[in-house]
Amino acid sequence: MFRGIVQGRGVIRSISKSEDSQRHGIAFPEGMFQLVDVDTVMLVNGCSLTVVRILGDMVYFDIDQALGTTTFDGLKEGDQVNLEIHPKFGEVVGRGGLTGNIKGTALVAAIEENDAGFSVLIDIPKGLAENLTVKDDIGIDGISLPITDMSDSIITLNYSRDLLASTNIASLAKDVKVNVEILNEW
Protein backbone atom coordinates (compact mmCIF):
# COMPACT_ATOMS: atom_id res chain seq x y z
CA MET A 1 0.00 0.00 0.00
CA PHE A 2 1.00 3.57 -0.70
CA ARG A 3 -0.03 6.61 1.32
CA GLY A 4 -1.68 8.56 -1.50
CA ILE A 5 0.50 11.54 -0.57
CA VAL A 6 2.60 12.81 -3.46
CA GLN A 7 6.29 13.15 -2.54
CA GLY A 8 7.38 15.03 -5.62
CA ARG A 9 6.71 16.03 -9.17
CA GLY A 10 8.70 14.55 -12.05
CA VAL A 11 8.99 15.73 -15.64
CA ILE A 12 8.73 13.34 -18.58
CA ARG A 13 11.89 13.82 -20.66
CA SER A 14 11.55 10.90 -23.09
CA ILE A 15 8.92 8.48 -24.36
CA SER A 16 9.81 5.47 -26.48
CA LYS A 17 6.82 3.69 -28.00
CA SER A 18 6.45 0.22 -29.45
CA GLU A 19 3.30 -1.53 -30.62
CA ASP A 20 2.04 -2.49 -27.16
CA SER A 21 4.27 -0.73 -24.64
CA GLN A 22 6.04 2.50 -23.80
CA ARG A 23 9.16 3.42 -21.86
CA HIS A 24 8.97 6.75 -20.05
CA GLY A 25 12.12 8.53 -18.90
CA ILE A 26 11.34 10.85 -16.00
CA ALA A 27 13.55 13.50 -14.42
CA PHE A 28 13.02 13.33 -10.66
CA PRO A 29 13.01 16.28 -8.25
CA GLU A 30 16.16 16.89 -6.26
CA GLY A 31 16.25 14.80 -3.09
CA MET A 32 13.95 12.11 -4.47
CA PHE A 33 16.30 10.74 -7.13
CA GLN A 34 18.64 9.30 -4.48
CA LEU A 35 15.79 7.26 -2.96
CA VAL A 36 15.20 5.02 -5.98
CA ASP A 37 17.07 2.13 -7.55
CA VAL A 38 16.30 -0.43 -10.24
CA ASP A 39 13.30 -2.52 -9.07
CA THR A 40 11.96 0.24 -6.79
CA VAL A 41 8.15 0.09 -6.86
CA MET A 42 6.43 3.46 -6.87
CA LEU A 43 3.40 5.40 -7.99
CA VAL A 44 3.57 7.52 -11.13
CA ASN A 45 0.33 9.51 -11.44
CA GLY A 46 -1.19 6.94 -9.11
CA CYS A 47 -0.19 3.87 -11.14
CA SER A 48 2.13 1.31 -9.56
CA LEU A 49 5.26 0.97 -11.73
CA THR A 50 8.71 -0.53 -11.26
CA VAL A 51 11.95 1.29 -12.05
CA VAL A 52 13.61 -0.62 -14.91
CA ARG A 53 16.63 1.60 -15.56
CA ILE A 54 18.47 4.60 -14.18
CA LEU A 55 20.75 6.50 -16.52
CA GLY A 56 22.28 9.80 -15.48
CA ASP A 57 19.51 11.82 -13.85
CA MET A 58 16.73 9.89 -15.62
CA VAL A 59 14.57 7.14 -14.13
CA TYR A 60 12.86 4.80 -16.62
CA PHE A 61 9.61 2.86 -16.38
CA ASP A 62 8.10 0.36 -18.83
CA ILE A 63 4.36 0.75 -19.28
CA ASP A 64 2.42 -2.01 -20.97
CA GLN A 65 -0.60 -3.42 -19.13
CA ALA A 66 -1.52 0.03 -17.80
CA LEU A 67 -1.78 1.67 -21.25
CA GLY A 68 -5.44 0.70 -21.69
CA THR A 69 -6.68 1.94 -18.31
CA THR A 70 -4.55 5.02 -17.60
CA THR A 71 -3.64 8.41 -19.04
CA PHE A 72 -0.09 7.32 -19.99
CA ASP A 73 -0.89 6.96 -23.69
CA GLY A 74 -1.80 10.66 -23.83
CA LEU A 75 1.23 12.01 -21.95
CA LYS A 76 3.99 13.80 -23.82
CA GLU A 77 7.51 15.02 -23.18
CA GLY A 78 7.49 17.97 -20.78
CA ASP A 79 4.37 16.81 -18.91
CA GLN A 80 4.62 16.67 -15.12
CA VAL A 81 3.72 13.54 -13.16
CA ASN A 82 3.06 12.90 -9.47
CA LEU A 83 5.55 10.58 -7.74
CA GLU A 84 5.39 8.51 -4.56
CA ILE A 85 7.90 5.89 -3.43
CA HIS A 86 6.52 2.77 -1.75
CA PRO A 87 6.77 3.10 2.05
CA LYS A 88 9.27 0.91 3.85
CA PHE A 89 7.99 -2.30 5.43
CA GLY A 90 6.27 -1.56 8.74
CA GLU A 91 5.56 2.13 8.08
CA VAL A 92 1.98 3.20 8.75
CA VAL A 93 0.04 4.06 5.61
CA GLY A 94 -3.06 5.59 7.24
CA ARG A 95 -6.47 6.36 5.82
CA GLY A 96 -6.88 6.49 2.07
CA GLY A 97 -3.97 4.23 1.19
CA LEU A 98 -3.55 3.46 -2.51
CA THR A 99 -2.58 0.20 -4.21
CA GLY A 100 -1.59 1.74 -7.55
CA ASN A 101 -4.20 -0.38 -9.34
CA ILE A 102 -5.81 2.19 -11.66
CA LYS A 103 -9.38 1.21 -12.57
CA GLY A 104 -9.85 3.74 -15.36
CA THR A 105 -9.77 7.39 -16.30
CA ALA A 106 -12.15 10.27 -15.76
CA LEU A 107 -12.52 13.82 -17.07
CA VAL A 108 -12.21 17.01 -15.07
CA ALA A 109 -15.63 18.68 -15.33
CA ALA A 110 -14.80 22.00 -13.63
CA ILE A 111 -12.40 23.72 -11.25
CA GLU A 112 -13.68 26.25 -8.73
CA GLU A 113 -11.58 28.40 -6.40
CA ASN A 114 -12.64 28.65 -2.77
CA ASP A 115 -11.25 30.10 0.48
CA ALA A 116 -9.23 26.99 1.37
CA GLY A 117 -7.90 26.32 -2.13
CA PHE A 118 -9.99 24.93 -4.92
CA SER A 119 -12.59 22.30 -5.69
CA VAL A 120 -12.18 19.95 -8.63
CA LEU A 121 -15.31 18.37 -10.08
CA ILE A 122 -14.58 15.08 -11.83
CA ASP A 123 -16.95 13.12 -14.07
CA ILE A 124 -16.37 9.52 -13.03
CA PRO A 125 -17.52 6.85 -15.53
CA LYS A 126 -20.73 5.22 -14.30
CA GLY A 127 -19.12 1.79 -13.93
CA LEU A 128 -16.57 3.24 -11.50
CA ALA A 129 -19.00 5.56 -9.71
CA GLU A 130 -21.70 3.06 -8.81
CA ASN A 131 -20.35 2.23 -5.31
CA LEU A 132 -18.99 5.68 -4.45
CA THR A 133 -20.51 7.88 -1.76
CA VAL A 134 -19.67 11.18 -0.12
CA LYS A 135 -16.74 10.81 2.33
CA ASP A 136 -15.30 7.78 0.48
CA ASP A 137 -11.63 8.18 -0.31
CA ILE A 138 -10.60 8.09 -3.96
CA GLY A 139 -7.24 8.25 -5.69
CA ILE A 140 -6.87 10.80 -8.49
CA ASP A 141 -3.44 10.82 -10.19
CA GLY A 142 -1.92 9.41 -6.99
CA ILE A 143 -3.53 11.88 -4.59
CA SER A 144 -5.90 10.28 -2.09
CA LEU A 145 -8.72 12.53 -0.87
CA PRO A 146 -12.25 12.12 0.48
CA ILE A 147 -15.17 12.90 -1.82
CA THR A 148 -16.84 16.02 -0.41
CA ASP A 149 -19.88 16.09 -2.71
CA MET A 150 -21.44 13.88 -5.34
CA SER A 151 -24.19 14.40 -7.89
CA ASP A 152 -24.84 11.46 -10.23
CA SER A 153 -21.35 10.61 -11.50
CA ILE A 154 -19.78 14.03 -10.75
CA ILE A 155 -17.65 13.98 -7.61
CA THR A 156 -16.12 16.98 -5.85
CA LEU A 157 -12.66 16.93 -4.26
CA ASN A 158 -11.21 19.83 -2.29
CA TYR A 159 -7.50 20.55 -2.75
CA SER A 160 -5.51 22.90 -0.53
CA ARG A 161 -3.26 25.53 -2.13
CA ASP A 162 -0.09 23.93 -0.73
CA LEU A 163 -0.60 20.95 -3.07
CA LEU A 164 0.09 23.24 -6.03
CA ALA A 165 3.81 23.28 -5.23
CA SER A 166 4.32 19.52 -4.80
CA THR A 167 1.93 17.97 -7.34
CA ASN A 168 0.84 18.34 -10.96
CA ILE A 169 -2.68 19.51 -10.10
CA ALA A 170 -1.92 23.05 -11.26
CA SER A 171 -2.05 21.61 -14.79
CA LEU A 172 -5.63 20.37 -14.36
CA ALA A 173 -8.22 22.01 -16.58
CA LYS A 174 -11.68 21.19 -17.90
CA ASP A 175 -11.71 17.99 -19.99
CA VAL A 176 -8.24 16.86 -18.83
CA LYS A 177 -8.09 13.09 -18.21
CA VAL A 178 -7.00 11.80 -14.79
CA ASN A 179 -6.22 8.33 -13.43
CA VAL A 180 -8.79 6.92 -10.98
CA GLU A 181 -8.30 4.37 -8.20
CA ILE A 182 -11.43 3.32 -6.32
CA LEU A 183 -10.61 2.54 -2.69
CA ASN A 184 -13.89 1.06 -1.42
CA GLU A 185 -14.05 -1.99 -3.68
CA TRP A 186 -14.96 -5.28 -2.11
Curated annotation (Swiss-Prot):
GO molecular function terms listed in the Swiss-Prot or TrEMBL record: riboflavin synthase activity
Cofactor(s) the protein requires to work: 6,7-dimethyl-8-(1-D-ribityl)lumazine
Pfam families membership: Lum_binding (PF00677)
Entry's cofactor comment: Binds 1 6,7-dimethyl-8-(1'-D-ribityl)lumazine non-covalently.
Annotated PANTHER family: RIBOFLAVIN SYNTHASE, RIBOFLAVIN SYNTHASE ALPHA CHAIN
Keywords from the named record: Luminescence, Repeat
Ranges of the Lumazine-binding repeats in the UniProt entry: 1-96, 97-186
Matches recorded under InterPro entries: ATP_synth_asu-like_sf, Lumazine-bd, Lumazine-bd_dom, Riboflavin_synthase-like_b-brl
GO BP annotations listed: bioluminescence; riboflavin biosynthetic process
UniProt keyword Transport, yes or no: no
Function: Antenna protein that modulates the color of the bioluminescence emission of the luciferase. In the presence of LumP, luciferase emission is shifted to higher energy values (shorter wavelength).
CDD domains assigned to the protein according to its UniProt record, in alphabetical order: LumP (cd16256)
PROSITE patterns tied to this protein: LUMAZINE_BIND
Protein known as: Lumazine protein
Ranges in a coiled coil: none
Domain of life, source organism: Bacteria
